[in-house]
Amino acid sequence: MNKSAIRYLSLLLVFLMGGSFLAGITTFGQTSSTAGGVTISVSNEWVGNDTVVLVAIYNPNVPQSAQGAKYVAGNVTISAGGVTVPLISNDTSNASVVYYLNNGQHYFWFFITMTPVPTTSASSLSMTETLTINSTSTNVQLTNPYLSFTTPVGNVQTDGKAGVFQLTLPSSFPNQLIGEYGQTVYGGHKVNITDLYFFSGDKTITISYSTGASVTINNYLADSSNYAATLQTTESTVPLNSTWQVYFVDNIMQANPLVGGNGGFMITANGTQVSPVIQNVSYLAVKNGVYVNTTVFANNPVPNAQAMFGYGNVYYGNFTMYTSSIVTNKTYATLLSGNNYTPANVSFSQYKMLITSGLFTTNTPITIYLSDWIGNNASVSIKGTIKETTLQSITLSVQKGENLTVNDFNNISNYSVRRNIMVYVALQNITGSTYKTAMVSLPETYAGSGVFSLPTVLRIGSSPSITYSTSQVTITLPPYDFSNTSLLITATNDIGASYYYLGSNTVKNISTPGTISVGTPTLVPIPNVVSVANVTPVIELAYTEPNLAFGTATTLTVSGTSVKYNGVQVATDSVTAVLPNGTVISGNLNGLSITSLTSANGNGTFFIVVPSTVIKTFLGTHTYIPSGTELTFKIYDEFAAQTLSVTYKFTTVAPVIAIKTPTSTSFSSAETAYLPPLPYNVVPEKHYISVNVTDTLYAQSVPSSALQTTLKIIVENPAGQKVGNVVTTVVSETAANSGLFTGKIYYTVYENSSGYWLNINGQNITNLKNVVNGGLIVFEYTSPSSQSTVNATALLEPSPFTLSVSQTSANPGQHVNVSVNSPGLVESSNMKFTGSLIIYAQFAEWNGPGSQPTIAVSPITLKEVSAGSPVFGGTIVLGNSSVVSSGNLTSLITTPGYTVAPGSVVLVNANATIGPTSTSSSITPYYQQQSISINVVDINVSILNPSPASPFAKLEIELQSPLFNLLTHPAAGNYTSAGTSAGILEGILSTITTQQSQQLVTSTQLVTSPKTSFYYNNTIWVIETPMTLWSGTPGSYGIPIEVNLTDLLTVTHNVYAIHVVEVPNVTTGTVSLVSAYAVPSVSSNVAQLQINGLVPPVISVFFNGNNITQSASAAIPFPNTTAGELVNVTVYAPDAVNNLNVPGSGTTFNVTIVNTANGETTTLTLTQMTKIIGGVAVPTPYYTGLLKVVEPTVYTPGTPGVISASSGVVNKVLVNMNLVEGQYYNTQGLLQQLRMKASSYFYVGVIKLSVLVSHFTILSNGTPVTGMQVGKSYSLLFNVTNNGNVNETIYGTLEVLLNGTPVQPEIVAQITLAPGQSTQIGTLFTPTMPGSYTITFIPFQNNLLSIPYNQGLTEVVTAS
């Protein structure tokens, strides 16, 4: 080659994961840029001689039209080496070169090249190279038939010369390109090209759009030394004689961006047309190859070309090639005319020679070189290897197939094409002899995998066979061959594997065994019992043959002794019976009327069902099966070559009896029956015992009818002796021939003058003492058919009896659950008693403070909680007369105004007259008692007035207790009298006293005064009574309560202790209540209230949650909307609370608002703030309201709660309070007022002073200029703006200096501006000499020019 050197750029692919590297198409470089919504893209990173590159500009804001194309052309520049030229210029081409792609997507195209202008028109352009290839000098000519140069008529120039380069579009180009002047270009026609040869000496060239988007491409003419083609391979390890794809990226070989295939160049070497790429495959250090011409398989388009160019078929020299693992030389390549070679494909003898001569081994380094025809090349190294051929073992069953697989890496001939190999499959008998062989073609799992496989299945047939298709291999065997057949799989190693792994110079076969998996069959009885009653209606067997489990319903046909599947015999059967006398009867399933067996769900289990009627016919007995008969079923299974057998033996079965008592959960022959704790006379319950008798022999005596029979009920004492009369009862068959007979009896205990009696089905049997503890109820049954007698027993025991309560302490009015647990109260496990169990409670009832408690007794109703439950439960209410008793809810007290006394006790009593300790000597009662302690409930007394309070306020006393809702009370609401609750309130309160005025008011004075009012709500009483200023007269007690101007008021109240007297009962072991009494005492907890009529009010003002009271820095802003600004005014005034002299009894008053800036006045109503404590709204000493501050333009004088603010000044707004607290007589006897006074203020508006000097302008005769000329006059003007929020008078100084020396007197200006207003301040100036003049303007706040707003603005202007 005649370049400076052949540049072998080797791309070494390092494979880390052991598999082939699938590179895919090489990633396209960064050849696109977006800015300002415009994207510019190029098709190639390199441009060179005779090559054309596409440039696309996507601008969605430019219309798709000729005008749009012209607009885009005017916004493109090209720059390199510090020189920038427009896209359309004489240095490039002044022809119309921009076209819009007519696809509706705003793409604009132009094409570029780096080709010198020829001297004349040319229909195509070429270049030549002389290269040394395979030691032979080769003359190469590369022609771009799509590139031409045309000399048009007119002033069209390219690189300063007449004419224009043009590109012929491919004839298959589907779109239209429309140029700047509306010219339309179709496929097969020419477009103009921009030539960049003006920049041929620059390594890089940048194409820019006016929005800032730009792309940079490389110039091959100036920088070919840095150009590098790249090569990537899809494989890292390959066998001998294989081919695969590589990707050769050679940008400079893409002559036409719109042409795939060879890229657009037409190339000849020594006069012979060749493809653009040649390749050399060498075994480095082993055997070198030569370059051979190779056909391009594919030219890959630019990734994402559709998005970049609006068209998908844009190319950049990314060639897909095929290469080979055979060294390319004359020995292993196909010779063509002109001494060219195609990639190697060797014959077997050549293949073997490469192996045996050691040229290709298990580790052969292969290097592949690819080159173009102008000297650019690249290489990649891979590994050639030989691997051992292996076969996978296989196990087949009818249910599960496996893949027949051969791993044959050496047989990969083309990594892009699947191929097949042949293997031999043989069937061998148990001795190892082959009796059937077939050759099977295995396909490759995917191209280049080297794994050859087909699914293989086992089928049942009448004769053995091996067949295959493209989808599977099928091996068919008759059942008798399953257990004695194996497989042998044989494949052929290629010569490489034979040589290196088997040490053979000839091709060797390898084999692996395969297995036929045979499932084990079974024959079992269902259920798994072989000794059965001779009255069993049906027997059933399960024949499980797993080799017939297909997953779908399967049927076997039974004919004679043969069992067949799809006509193929799978088993034989026989049935043999041996009678008790030794007679043998032989037959088969057919003889038992069985013609088929079915596995309904396809799991391989087939059910053999034989009714007893068929068995009787088979035996010849017809009416019965003799006891002792044996029946044997045999099946010979041909899959497993195994005989399966089950033998039944028939026996006679005795009847069975079982009972179920009220408390048992299932039937058995022995149960316990609990006696009721109370006789039927008290609790009318019947207790049922169910009886089940199973007598199949008797049922079969008349199988067509449901029969009845009787059994005896016998009562025995604990010694086993019968007592009383025998009772009979009838049991009935549930259905014809079912053999199950059912019935039931009931038992109770009756009390009469002679004592307690056990009663069965309404008959008194015996005195209860005879059986009370250990007696039996015996159920005796004798079968009418077999005369067998069986019995069941119910053991009689006295019932446990337990009383319980859900809690042992409770509050008055609370609900408490009470229950009795006694199994003797159960009627039946599935019955619920509809009656009640009555027990009793003893307690102390109380009418509240001021009264004494009394002892009372109340019945309690209990109900069975659920069917069959031994628990009878109920709920008692401990003293809430508003609750009505219903069902098992019992309210102990029904008298209104009474409750169970707090601090007392409730006794709950339940008795069992037939107790658990009863014996044959005596029926003993049993007593149960539970105690519930009643909690002491406090009565809380508090004062609701906020402290301190005014002497003129109403006193509010709150009494709180849950007892109030239980005692006498009115409906919730306000009252002027306590009514019937007065005694309770008097009993709670004790006295009201004052420290300074020495008042003493009793509870009776307070509650009965007509000036006192009341509020009641559930658990709360509130008592309100007036206070007034003490006149000074001692001992003047009463209502209103007279207090000093400063005083301390105290409220005391009573508490009550309840005492009950209990007396024990020696007989029952319980206690009884005989009396109760209440003892009052004064509580140590007192409620107090500070009285102070001299507390000054405090006014606070808030804006947006911030306190702005009397704060200049926290003023509210000037209102700038019609809605204005809201200000919260809050006054702390404890002496106004509950004060009758204040409007609304101390809940509201007015304050006066005065704006001192404009003299406006308004009133603002404040409302008392409350807080909820215990459900009661409690007043606070705080009063609040919202004041609205608005602009003067929307203000209406006299509107309450609204005031305006003057703009431009700070508004000081006063808030004044002057309110009468009360009246009093001074020492001279004159009536005087006591007033609450306060005053405060806040500010509206913060003055902002700000002046901005923002711009300097020079005018010459009204026209702006940037410089001055000596002797001419100019207006020097500064822009001044009032950025503050008030009117401002601005003083300013303007100076003009030259070299630091003033050239005219300082000018002082004065101007007044409103907020936001701007003006210009300046002077007329004529420069007298050239130089740089400094012009400065500084704004000041005062006429003394001592307080500047800011540093002003300084400008430097040159005069010439």
From Swiss-Prot:
**One Gene Ontology cellular component annotation held by this UniProt entry:** extracellular region
| Taxonomic placement | Archaea, Thermoproteota, Thermoprotei, Sulfolobales, Sulfolobaceae
Superkingdom is Archaea
Q: Residue span of the signal peptide, if any?
A: 1-24
Q: What is this protein called?
A: S-layer protein A
Subunit info? Answer: The mushroom-shaped unit cells of the Sulfolobales' S-layers may consist of three SlaB subunits and six SlaA subunits.
Q: Which UniProt keywords apply?
A: Cell wall, S-layer, Secreted, Signal
Q: Which gene encodes it?
A: slaA
Q: Where in the cell is it found?
A: Secreted, Cell wall, S-layer
InterPro entries, alphabetized:
SlaA-like
Functional summary from the UniProt entry: S-layer large protein. May form the highly ordered outer sheath.
Tell me which family the UniProt entry assigns to this protein: Belongs to the Sulfolobales SlaA family.
